[in-house]
Amino acid sequence: MLRRLVMAAACLLLSVQLGAADEKTKGKLSIWLGYPETLDAFKLGQAEFKKKYPNVDVEILTFELREFEAKLAVSVPAGSGPDILALHDFIFPRYHEGGSLADMPADLAQVVNTKTIIDTPFRDIVTRDGKPWGLPWWSGRNGLFYNIDHLQAAGLSGPPKSYAEVWQYAEKLTQKNAAGEVTRAGISLRLTGPSGGTQKFGYFYYQLAGVQMFEPGKKPGTVQVTIAKNIDAAARVLLDHVEHLHGPKKSDDWALKHDAQGFASGAASMFMRESWVIPFVRKNGPDIKFGVVPVPREKSFGAFNAVEVLSVNKDSKLKDAAWDFIRILQDQAIVNNVLESSGWVPLRRDRDYSAVLSKEPRFAQMTSPPADQVQYIEAPNVAYEEMTTRVGEVIQAGFRDASLVGNLEGAKRVMMRAHDTAVKILKDNGNYSD
């Protein structure tokens, strides 16, 4: 009861801060989104915003993510672009280092700096020299998704609990035809799209190594490459992929439908992805009975987080109104909409998500992660796209090399190429950290 009273007080405080209607402020507030699935939340915010700013028009445009990033990269440095910058964590440094972000109001900075509201890992990615430059809004937190009917048919009583069990389950869940071709993947692996492939390979790597392949460096925006120091773990992850793509343990194939589409169609029994999969499968695979658990542990127990940050363009002519819109987006009804409609996990720890969880309890794995699970975030840096793409190309070429089956030394050589590729790119961009 006390928690709910505190949350109600916080929502009341938000309303007080917005104050009476402002009829003097006029103009157009522009918002661009690279995640169209959050549009409904912004429209809810727009309706509330108009009560405070009746003479400000709000324009919300949505784009495919890469198009969104490209448009921002051209417009913002030129002094234009949207008023509100909805920045993914890996592009946030580009706009901070480019001097494109407006100062945060003190009340929102206090929100970011209060651990009971925004957890420390998420505060840190937006903070430079003790000063936050954006509000972490939602996270894409990963988990292991599994088909309940497939597990039961294979005589498996529940989802895997360890890294080793993931691969053992994959072998038991795989179906093959008379010619030995995989017709249903035991686990759908990320085999294409090198940048995303690097990220998904990292889900496995973290549990074995206890660190990411690319950790934040000593200075914000710099990166340490950890592969060489954890070469045994890196090679083991590569070998496990290769041995489940070739030979008797084969549990996946490039010819199959992959990722969320494969899982929602029943073409895969397990896969690892972020929280948006829950509403996606509900919509696209309504007959699929599925569960989700944290990524199974090994040496370590961590969860990847992809974070969306809300900042204001320093060249905006409506900065105060833009920050008020961001305040409105913290409202309970709006963060509930983000979770329920898009599957992204709001980062406000002082909000009550029980209304959504009562309808979709699988979200609880994301909103209330285990106490001993480490929440980690990719090291944001301006060379992110190039680095993860080139490293992913090395790793995914390794996936196709059947000569690596049982070849630990060969796997180590591949992963050292990945290490050296990342180091060179980071040094060339001035982002490398020892």
Where are these regions (language model features)?
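Hinge/lid segment of periplasmic solute-binding proteins
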Residues: 89-141, 198-200, 206, 287-293, ...
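Extracytoplasmic "Venus flytrap"/periplasmic binding protein-like
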Residues: 44, 48-118, 149-161, 261-262, ...
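A bilobed periplasmic-binding-protein/Venus flytrap-type ligand-binding module shared by bacterial periplasmic
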Residues: 145-148, 305-317
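Glycine-centered hinge/linker elements that transmit conformational signals in sensory
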Residues: 169-171, 217-252, 295
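Conserved C-terminal helix/tail region of periplasmic/extracytoplasmic solute-binding proteins
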Residues: 23-24, 57, 152, 374-434
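Short, well-ordered beta-strand elements
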Residues: 25-36, 56-61, 84, 133
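Extracytoplasmic/periplasmic solute-binding protein
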Residues: 131-137, 142, 167-223, 268
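Long, aromatic- and glycine/proline-rich binding clefts that accommodate carbohydrate-like moieties
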Residues: 120-125, 286, 290-293, 340-393, ...
